[in-house]
């Protein structure tokens, strides 16, 4: 029947295309497919597919290099930095067979064949330690320089503080050692400490005068002759004992404060809570108009007559007291 022949021809055509036999009853019979053709050059195909692939695709890097017909390294290479032969092969960089990575044990640095040389050691410990050491030295030197500069900066201020405590003196007091017998225990000094030593010795002489010692015979003699020193000194110490030595000076007046011409208790001028006392440290008195203060007209001359070494009997006097001698004309 032509219809059956046409149907069989159609089944054969499906067999050639699908690789299976379909019977007229609807049964499908499996048929094995023909094997694939083998690659004539399997090595070339393996290199093309495995180059640049990670190692999980199968085989080690050495095996892959052998399959890629890469010759093995003949001995250790020389380091391009230090020319040391103490090197070793590490691995292929980025799983690329064209970038073998080596390590130099001499300079402890890696390098890649065909790559740039980086001067970074393994771990970077040495360079980091050197930087810390250098920074520490720099910090220590900077701190020492700051300390020295602070010391130098403090020295002028201390010098100024020291000079501010010095007292002004008359130039005639610099030669007091030549007069002798005034009992000030002065020594010839040089430099800036001269005025300071004179001031300290004069202050001690003031305190010694109040206690009745450390004074010369002419000065104490005149005071003892003209005054009843026992009662006067007791009254003076009773009133001045609670005051500091600097409270004896009147800061409000530029000249000496003379209140009475009686005994020494009146000359000190104890009035109220403040005590005015003649400063034994001779100040350079400012210019005073003679018309305004006629009683002190003779004070424009050198104070206490210290310029003439010949008059040593009553040269050092207590202004305001009854002294006999050349100094009485000042009163």
Swiss-Prot record:
Zinc finger feature spans (Dof-type): 77-131
Example GO molecular function: DNA-binding transcription factor activity
Keywords, alphabetical: DNA-binding, Metal-binding, Nucleus, Transcription, Transcription regulation, Zinc, Zinc-finger
GO biological process, one term: response to wounding
Conditions for induction: By auxin and salicylic acid (SA). Induced transiently in response to the generalist herbivore S.littoralis. Triggered by methyl jasmonate (MeJA) and wounding.
UniProt feature, compositional bias: Polar residues: 305-316
Disruption phenotype: Reduced expression of CYP83B1. Longer hypocotyls and increased lateral root formation.
Subcellular location: Nucleus
InterPro entries: Dof, Znf_Dof
Job of this protein: Transcription factor that binds specifically to a 5'-AA[AG]G-3' consensus core sequence. Enhances the DNA binding of OBF transcription factors to OCS elements. Involved in the regulation of root development. The PEAR proteins (e.g. DOF2.4, DOF5.1, DOF3.2, DOF1.1, DOF5.6 and DOF5.3) activate gene expression that promotes radial growth of protophloem sieve elements. Element of a regulatory network controlling indole glucosinolates (IGS) biosynthesis, probably by inducing the expression of accurate genes (e.g. CYP83B1). Promotes apical dominance.
Protein name as catalogued: Dof zinc finger protein DOF1.1
Natural source organism: Arabidopsis thaliana
Organism lineage: Eukaryota, Viridiplantae, Streptophyta, Embryophyta, Tracheophyta
